[in-house]
Regions:
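Active-site-proximal cap/loop segments of hydrolase catalytic domains
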Residues: 134, 140-195
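A catalytic-pocket lid/entrance helix-loop region that shapes and gates access to the active site
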Residues: 136-147, 217-276, 308, 320-333, ...
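Catalytic-loop region of hydrolases
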Residues: 2-9, 20-152, 275-277, 402-403, ...
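Conserved alpha/beta-hydrolase "acid-adjacent" motif
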Residues: 426-431
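Catalytic histidine-centered segment of alpha/beta-hydrolase-like enzymes
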Residues: 451-462
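Alpha/beta-hydrolase fold nucleophile elbow
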Residues: 197-208
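Short beta-strand/loop motif that positions the catalytic acidic residue
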Residues: 413, 418-421
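Alpha/beta-hydrolase fold active-site neighborhood
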Residues: 27, 276-414, 442, 457-459, ...
Length: 523
């Protein structure tokens, strides 16, 4: 989950005939549930080539209330269970977004051999995305140039931009746009279940995929077996309310870094208290308001660079970086590389305006002054890490279409699953995961002291992987609240140690962030 303006992508929808099988389900959707899934070698560009991975398409109605109003194609991928005698069904996956391509998710579980023995792992591009029938959205220039500390007069620029995004997506999306939604994607998942001949599916969803999984379970409780919601959203809050949680998490990570650095004043010389360390950042930012300083071209670049404090393993190098600027040794090439690495590790723009359609399911304030007041508050108190942009109006502030339906109340009438969240994740903060776990009355795995987003099968976290695998394979849940140590570990720099003695912090910050960016690419 991250506020992004999706890139334009154009593709004509494809349509196929439906063929019945023995897995019939009565009703007007019978032909969709009983279609034959023709697995074959994946077309070039769908997924990274790998032995045993197949692809197919499933046909779904654009509008489930009026199935005669046109069809959409949903692209799916499969890695079959390696031990057919022990096979217990399919494991459907979603990477989040909204709008993330999930065909390649079948590769994420390659190291989880126990899971691969018993499940067919299924990836999918949700409706509107990638190799499925794409939603059209006319391209809009990026908002990357917007300042991190806008003047009052500049606040309206966000509204103008958001209006243009909404207008372009509405023109490009046409009738299909109203039907690209969490609820319809959940219905597509149930059609996939039926078409595969399964009575139930198990599920692993990340980020927004946790909301999708919770909605799927609410709409189709008899169809859901085991479920893992990793980096969960808060099912009781609107998208904008969760943006507030994101800003709070960014601020909390910054605070923790100042505490860590203050405890090592003898190493970095940035102050013996968190307030003193924060004052060093403020001093750099103040100089940047007047012009280039410390290698940075402007204060906006520096503000976003401070967002690196979410990653614990970057703390030592970031402290060293700030100390070098304080000493007058700022390097423009390093500063540019830091910003580039953070952008590379950020979430890719989601496909074809899907994000801009799905997020409009939530209620949004329509009075722009509500956003402007929040933007000014964060600009004046804590602008580091891009907080102001999270508070800005979005295209949904100016939504041009009427929602066909609201998100249903999240309920659980299916077997208990798992929620996984970390206490440093800024995209889906731990507070969101706590609410999801409490609302569903399921166990929560807290990944401690870790700023990464998405954990199971992605971070080589033996504790998380073992607990989730045990549940998925054997149905054994952990205690209601479990803590696993994170893998995003701050370097052990004892107080008083000279910075030059630190092996990791001797590496450039940009190099460390570049490694993190590669690891983060699933999102």
């Amino acid at each position: 989950m991250r506020k992004r303006w999706g890139a334009a992508a154009l593709a004509a929808p494809l349509f196929m005939s439906l063929v019945g099988t023995a897995h019939a389900e009565p009703g007007p959707l019978d032909e969709y549930y009983t279609q034959t899934v023709a697995w074959a070698e994946c077309p070039a560009g769908w997924v990274t080539p790998s032995t045993g991975v197949e692809c197919a398409t499933v046909i779904v109605p654009m509008d489930y209330k009026n199935p005669g109003n046109g069809n959409l194609e949903i692209a799916i991928s499969r890695k079959k269970a390696t031990d057919p005698a022990r096979r217990r069904g399919v494991l459907l996956t979603n990477p989040g977004g909204p709008g993330g391509s999930g065909l390649g998710a079948v590769h994420w579980f390659n190291a989880q051999t126990d899971v691969l023995r018993v499940y067919d792992v299924i990836g999918m591009d949700p409706r509107g995305v990638g190799r499925s029938t794409q939603l059209r959205c006319i391209s809009t220039p990026s908002d990357d140039a917007f300042p991190s500390r806008p003047t009052d007069a500049q606040l309206s620029n966000w509204s103008e931009y958001a209006r243009s995004v909404e207008a372009n997506c509405e023109r490009g999306g046409g009738e299909m746009r109203r039907f690209v939604s969490t609820m319809n994607t959940a219905r597509d998942m149930d059609v996939i279940r039926g078409a595969l001949g399964e009575k139930k599916v198990s599920y692993v969803g990340y980020s927004y995929g946790t909301q999708l999984g919770a909605v799927f379970g609410s709409l189709f409780p008899k169809s859901l077996d085991r479920s893992v919601l990793d980096s969960a959203l808060d099912p009781l809050k609107t998208w904008h309310e969760q943006d507030v949680d994101v800003v709070d998490a960014i601020t909390d990570n910054l605070r923790k870094w100042t505490e860590w650095t203050a405890a090592r004043n003898g190493t970095y010389g940035l102050g013996a208290t968190p307030a003193a360390v924060r004052a060093e950042l403020d001093a750099i930012a103040e100089k940047l308001k007047a012009g280039p300083h410390g290698g940075y071209a402007d204060v906006t670049s520096f503000d976003y660079a401070v967002g690196a404090t979410r990653y614990r393993r970057s703390w030592a190098a970031f402290s060293r970086h700030i100390a070098s600027i304080k000493a007058g040794a700022g390097d423009p090439a390093e500063a540019s590389a830091i910003v580039a690495a953070l952008k590379k590790g950020d979430i890719e723009p989601t496909s074809a305006g899907t994000y801009q359609a799905v997020t409009c399911e939530w209620d949004w304030f329509t009075d722009v002054n509500t956003y402007y007041n929040d933007m000014k508050r964060w600009r004046d108190t804590q602008p580091y890490g891009g907080t102001v942009d999270y508070m800005a109006p979005t295209n949904c502030t100016f939504r041009a279409f009427k929602r066909p339906e609201k998100i249903p109340a999240i309920t659980r009438k299916y077997p208990a699953g798992l929620v996984v969240n970390s206490d440093g994740d800024t995209q889906t903060p731990l507070a969101n995961g706590r609410v999801m776990a409490e609302h569903l009355n399921v166990p929560l795995i807290n990944v401690a002291n870790d700023g990464q987003h998405g954990h199971y099968a992605l971070r080589r976290n033996a504790c998380v992987d073992a607990l989730v695998n045990k549940y998925l394979v054997s149905g054994i849940l952990p205690a209601s609240r479990v803590t696993c140590a994170g893998t995003d570990i701050a370097e052990n720099v004892p107080p008083g140690q000279a910075a030059s003695m630190s092996v990791q912090s001797a590496r450039p910050l940009s190099e460390i962030l570049g490694e993190i960016a590669v690891e983060t690419k699933p999102f």
